[in-house]
């Protein structure tokens, strides 16, 4: 256990996250990384969420709230946007009802996936199938193969440390269910991935193993082309706008990794403190049996400490189940984005090498071969898709972290309110004893 309050986040490089320019902020490559460019609101998340969202006048209460007692209104503001989006969607997917299956060779969990859609690609308006984790992994692999130019959402980590995390515990299964539900909803909201044939099969096929054994190859021409890029070409210079994206992702992942490690230490200390509280409160209760006039106040203190320990347990559970999974998801998200960026670099390197070979030909006006033009088309497609997915990812990140941090603030307010009420409740009791004397 750490011997004091967590230290401030250590520096991870010469550039802080807030000082780094937004990768897509400028209209040109130079503006994207220029030292004079103004950081976008998305990268100023640590300072504010916008002038209208979290203005803290006189005393720090967010504008629009009368007191900490109305803290739940912080989360209520976020529901309106979701309701509006739901009116325009034509595909809804829900992951629920986890079930444990015990077989001779293995034990595993399956999840029910319910799909409702009005799209013509679906023969029925509603489907219900059961899938296990390795089926989700299969889907993600197929999406990476068939849509190499797009950012594929990450899955939660498959492996857990035996003896430390029980992968069949109710808490672990529920955390994984939420992550898998988020994974499918990310795909559902994507304008390209949601129409992928592998995704359709995943949502509708009763027996997915039959498709796996057939080894169906539904790769697009783009997927085949990128799949056979061996990486033997060396990129000379990454364009400035994509270099800015790479730098941002590196710094972003480092910051989240640091927050994740510190948050885990905080949770560990809170759990240890909770153990001490549970031993601390009953001492006053047993002491009260030896006292006369002090018996009632001592029982009150014992009950107060018990209420505080219950509130702390709820706060710790919220951090474990809601806060940490989002951090880890976005750390994995940044790795996925780096992978797509690397594929884009390989295509550009191939194009530059082929173009240079044409330029070296001893001809006055060498004709550009068709394969070079196709390579250029692939590179331009990669650039466009990567920019669009990066912008979509930034929007999702802003929404997710805004909700995460507001939820964290709300839970902390509730925790301290409960502790305050617990301690205030014994004051009248102590005053009565003093007046009686």
UniProtKB/Swiss-Prot annotation:
Pfam families found in the cross-reference section: BAR (PF03114), PX (PF00787)
Modified residues (Phosphothreonine): 38
A Gene Ontology term for the protein's cellular component: early endosome membrane
UniProt-listed SUPFAM superfamilies: BAR/IMD domain-like (SSF103657), PX domain (SSF64268)
Organism expressing this protein natively: Homo sapiens
GO biological process terms on file: endocytic recycling; mitophagy; piecemeal microautophagy of the nucleus; positive regulation of autophagosome assembly; protein transport; reticulophagy
Gene3D superfamilies: Arfaptin homology (AH) domain/BAR domain, Phox-like domain
Ranges for domain PX: 89-210
InterPro entries reported in the protein's UniProt record: AH/BAR_dom_sf, BAR_dom, PX_dom, PX_dom_sf, SNX30_BAR
Compartments, record wording: Early endosome membrane
Membrane topology (UniProt): Peripheral membrane protein
Name this protein carries in UniProt: Sorting nexin-30
Comp. bias regions, Low complexity: 63-73
Region (Disordered): 1-44, 54-73
Disulfide bonds: none
Positions of post-translational Phosphoserine modification: 40
Alphabetized UniProt keyword annotations: Endosome, Membrane, Phosphoprotein, Protein transport, Transport
Subunit structure: Heterodimer; heterodimerizes with SNX4.
Family: Belongs to the sorting nexin family.
């Amino acid at each position: 256990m750490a011997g004091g309050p967590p230290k401030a986040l250590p520096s991870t490089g010469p550039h802080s996250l807030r000082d780094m320019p937004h990768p897509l902020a400028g209209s040109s490559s130079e503006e994207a990384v220029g030292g004079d460019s103004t950081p976008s609101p998305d990268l100023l998340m640590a300072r504010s969420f916008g002038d209208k969202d979290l203005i803290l006048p006189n005393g720090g209460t967010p504008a629009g709230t009368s007191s900490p007692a109305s803290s739940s209104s912080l989360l209520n503001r976020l529901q309106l946007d979701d309701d509006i989006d739901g009116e325009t969607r034509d595909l809804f997917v829900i992951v629920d009802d986890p079930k444990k299956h015990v077989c001779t060779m293995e034990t595993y969990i399956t999840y029910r996936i319910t799909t409702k859609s009005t799209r013509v690609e679906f023969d029925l308006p509603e489907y219900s199938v059961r899938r296990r984790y390795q089926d989700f992994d299969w889907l993600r692999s197929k999406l990476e193969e068939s849509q190499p130019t797009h950012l594929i959402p990450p899955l939660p980590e498959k492996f857990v440390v035996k003896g430390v995390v029980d992968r069949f515990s109710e808490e672990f299964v529920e955390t994984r269910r939420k992550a898998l539900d988020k994974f499918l909803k990310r795909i559902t909201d994507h304008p390209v991935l949601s129409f992928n044939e592998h995704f359709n099969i995943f949502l509708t096929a009763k027996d997915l193993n039959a498709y796996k054994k057939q080894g169906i190859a539904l790769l697009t021409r783009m997927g085949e082309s990128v799949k056979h890029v061996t990486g033997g070409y060396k990129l000379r210079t990454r364009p400035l706008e994509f270099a800015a994206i790479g730098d941002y992702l590196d710094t972003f992942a480092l910051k989240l990794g640091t927050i994740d490690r510190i948050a885990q230490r905080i949770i560990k200390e809170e759990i240890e403190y909770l153990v001490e509280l549970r031993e601390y409160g009953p001492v006053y209760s047993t002491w009260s049996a030896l006292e006369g006039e002090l018996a009632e106040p001592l029982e009150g203190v014992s009950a107060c400490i018990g209420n505080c320990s219950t509130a702390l347990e709820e706060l710790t559970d919220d951090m474990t189940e809601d806060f940490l999974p989002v951090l880890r998801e976005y750390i994995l998200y940044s790795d996925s984005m780096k992978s797509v960026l690397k594929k884009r670099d390989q295509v550009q390197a191939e194009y530059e090498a082929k173009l240079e070979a044409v330029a070296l030909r001893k001809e006055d006006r060498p004709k550009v071969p068709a394969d070079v033009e196709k390579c250029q088309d692939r590179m331009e497609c990669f650039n466009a898709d990567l920019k669009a997915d990066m912008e979509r990812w930034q929007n999702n990140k802003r929404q997710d972290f805004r909700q995460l941090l507001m939820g964290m603030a709300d839970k902390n307010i509730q925790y301290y309110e409960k502790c305050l009420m617990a301690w205030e409740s014994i004051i009248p009791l102590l005053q009565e004893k003093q007046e009686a004397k």
